[in-house]
Amino acid sequence: MSDDEDMMYDDDEYFDDDEDQDQNDSESEGVEIENQYYNSKGLIDESIPDAIKSYEKVVDLENGEKGEWGFKALKKITKLYFRIGDFDNMLESFKKFLPYTKSSASSNYIEKGINSVLDMVSSSNTIELDMIQKVFDLTLKSLLDTKNERVWFRTNLKLAKLLFEKAEYGRLAKILRDLHKSCELEDGTDDQKKGSQLVDIYALEIQMYTETKNNKKLKDLYKKALEIKSAIPHPRIMGIIRECGGKMHMAEKEWEKAHTDFFEAFKNYDEAGNSRRIQCLKYLVLACMLMLSTINPFDSTEAKPYKNDPDILAMTNLVMAYEKNDIYAFEKILKDNRKTIMDDPFIRMYIEDLLRNIRTQVLLKLLKPYTRIRISFISKELNIPSSDVESLLVSLILDNKIRGSIDQVNQQLELDTAKSSAYWKYTSIHKWANQIGQLNGGINNKLVS
């Protein structure tokens, strides 16, 4: 072997040794960082401040490389500061954590890490909303910088849901505008390719307008949400949209439309395994009674299994009393089941309508054999004050459901069915004759011209 060959061999051997040494050093550093991380974890139960310092050393050992262990350590530091209520330092450590999300780690891994922090602050009752908003704002800015649109959308949606739960409708409206903008084409119309995102936005917006009772906006959004065909929304989302639609129709006393929507909402919640199905079933029963349907809502295949559910049983009994026009039983069920019926603000809004319906049915049946009846007697039968009886009678007379008049002096209702029958027959014929006369006059005028 020549001297040159010897030299070449020695150089190669030296280079290989260096590579092995570098690899060993790297592995050694990796082991050291990993050990430091787990040592820090062991300090949490003993002393959180010491654990924080130990986790900070993990970050220092990475020498600015922003690796996996630094990502985990800063996430832990953020959570530990939160645990001890030091929210200012929590925010500072979170600021240091966010640049690690720009690393080569997978999007799912990053999203999981971010969500663990966001869920932590969102579910707390000890941290102020302004601080929570700062955490979200920092996250959203970081996600925009990295052009991670999918996670940005989901994070914004998470913030929007939180603001809805806290009834912060002003802040929520701004977030919803940003979300809408992200799903628009250049001409400002909805990008139908983003159907799933649009349905999520509409569902949240519909809930907001339901709570604020803005039926004008609600109608438009409800229609738009149902028109989206480019996505198959999660049944829970459709349950939300349909439930809000039912409430919208109830506000306008469109009982049949409300019944349809509540039934669809119930089915969707049931499919999703969502506990909201029970509440929607109650609303379905409510709408069914208000529309004076003769069909028992529990006769349907979907609702039948819940007929004897403890939370539904009171509504089942209410339907039975309602169908029998048993006022005393109806009122007793309401009184005995305040928690499952009357404590729901939405149901409570329509109890008077139900009572009016059942009182009307009992009253009309009560009046059949009489031509004259005392208001005090009706009051006793309906279990309401005489003043309420008078109001109900006036309303029914104006609606042409009762043909008679109230004698205020003797406090009685006088019915004149024979006269009324002839009167109404004459009125109908007279109205029909007038309409024919107007039509005939219009035709003659056209012929003359």
From Swiss-Prot:
GO biological process, one term: protein deneddylation
Residue stretches making up the PCI domain: 251-420
GO CC aspect terms: COP9 signalosome; cytoplasm
Chain segments annotated as transmembrane: none
Annotated localization: Cytoplasm; Nucleus
SUPFAM superfamilies: Winged helix' DNA-binding domain
SMART domains, A to Z: PAM, PINT
Main location: cytoplasm
Record region (Disordered): 1-32
Entry-linked InterPro entries: 26S_Proteasome/COP9_Components, PCI_dom, WH_DNA-bd_sf
Sorted UniProt keywords: Cytoplasm, Nucleus, Signalosome
Family: Belongs to the CSN2 family.
Subunit structure of this chain's protein: Component of the CSN complex. The holocomplex is comprised of 8 subunits csn1-8. In the complex, it probably interacts directly with csn1, csn3, csn5, csn6, csn7 and csn8.
Role description: Essential component of the COP9 signalosome complex (CSN), a complex involved in various cellular and developmental processes. The CSN complex is an essential regulator of the ubiquitin (Ubl) conjugation pathway by mediating the deneddylation of the cullin subunits of E3 ligase complexes, leading to modify the Ubl ligase activity.
Protein name, entry field: COP9 signalosome complex subunit 2
The species this protein was found in: Dictyostelium discoideum
